[in-house]
Amino acid sequence: MTSAHNAPAPKQVDAKHVGALMAALMAAIFAFQLNASMLSPVLTTMRVELNITDAEIGLTQTVFFTACAVFSLFLPRLGDLKGRKKVLIGMLACTAIGCVISACATNVTMLMIGRVIQGVAGPVVPMTLLMLHAEVTDNARYARLMAILTSVNGGIAGVDALLGGWLAGNFGFRSVFWVMCGVAVLAVVLVWSFARESTADETPKMDWLGAILLSAAFLAAYLAINEIEKLAGANWWLIAIEIVVAAVLFVIFWHVENAQKNPMVTTTYLKERRTWGLLLTTLLTMTGVFAVMNGIVPALAQDTSVGASMSADTVSLATLTPYALVGLVFGPVAGVIASKMGYRSTLRGGLIVSAIAMVFGVFVCQSPHIWGLVVLSVVLGLSYAGTANIMLNGLGIVLSPEDNPGYLPGLNAGAFNLGAGLSYAILYGVQQGFSDAHGATMGYTGAMIAGIILLVLAFLSSLLIPKPAQNAAEEH
């Protein structure tokens, strides 16, 4: 990586071009985000109209997010070699095709095929951040613009889900997929018109063997985590087999990469703190927070025996909407802070505030009230969705070496996905264990305490992340 002392001067980029580029990249992120979040209130309508079971409709979501995770591992690297604009347009085109297939689905198999193809859009965020970084080399300016793009990734302040519910209620679930398709096509046009092509400094042939082995190892680990999430209903023999398969495939991947002339990821980079330090921090952060806001808090809010006894609609408005809205609004502010204090310092601040918020959450679990849940959601929206999540994405870009800028954002996306799955497995497991032994209130409390411990570990792990050499603003 270029050091901060001998880095070339940032190139001057026309403000109008950057504005047009931001609009195009934002459209691409919208196209992906709608596929991820717009269907949440539509699942029941889809189940009824297709006459399928809850388990089958849940599986269509699982295959989408699994596809997102797998494609995220290698498409950013393919963009390094073949051209990021070209690959991004291909991803968006595949997403549009997947939306058409899903909109025309007459059975669950056809719907699953469509959702898998939509999952090609999984690495849109790291791809757009790499494209932005190729154009905007001034670190302070990049930090601010990066935060604007990334802040959208948590959902468009709940408006996307509300729109999805309205469309499904008035026009059926197929209308939702047609809207997604339209946004994806618009994104293709904007990226084609306003983005410039960029590649890595070196563009050897793609290491497809390494990509396949890494993807297979990740898929085995991901499937094991999905099975663990079933808790008492999990098949532990299957989990053990999948974990062994994942480990064996990763060992083979390691040896293959050592032997390759132009590997997908050199093992030298994998051994460095910029790789494993960041990936460990991302994994621990996601594991500590994700299921809290997307599972534990909504469940506590709706619990009629020991919770706040809120309706499902009220829960969304009181917890998930303010969480997403604050994250969306505060993200650009976090970018400004990062441009002055550095990514690592801003990340650590976000982790500390998140842990403090969850300490408050322990008291909320003991005496649940709507306003306590609102405060918890707002603070976590600010500290995690609007700060820590954005800084982790940003570090994946600025810590990457110039000869292979796509590998770390891809692996980091994998860590985000694994962390999300582990969060449900670990925090729900703790909740169930404490609940069985000490009652429901202690179940919620135990899950919150487990989240705090994981965030403390994430903070300690963040101390191992090295200073981004290309970030002259980083002081600590």
Question: Where are the regions a protein language model picked out?
Answer:
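12-transmembrane solute porter fold
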Residues: V18-F32, L39-P41, D54, M264-A469
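Extracellular/periplasmic helix-loop-helix junction of adjacent transmembrane segments
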Residues: S40-F71, V108-M110, D313-A318
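Central cavity-lining transmembrane alpha-helices of secondary-active solute carriers
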Residues: T62-R77, P126-L130, T321-V333
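Paired small-residue
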Residues: C94, G98-I101, T109-Q118, W371-V379
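Cytoplasmic helix-loop-helix junction between adjacent transmembrane helices
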Residues: V116-S151, E202
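Hydrophobic transmembrane-helix bundles of small-molecule transporters
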Residues: G169-T281
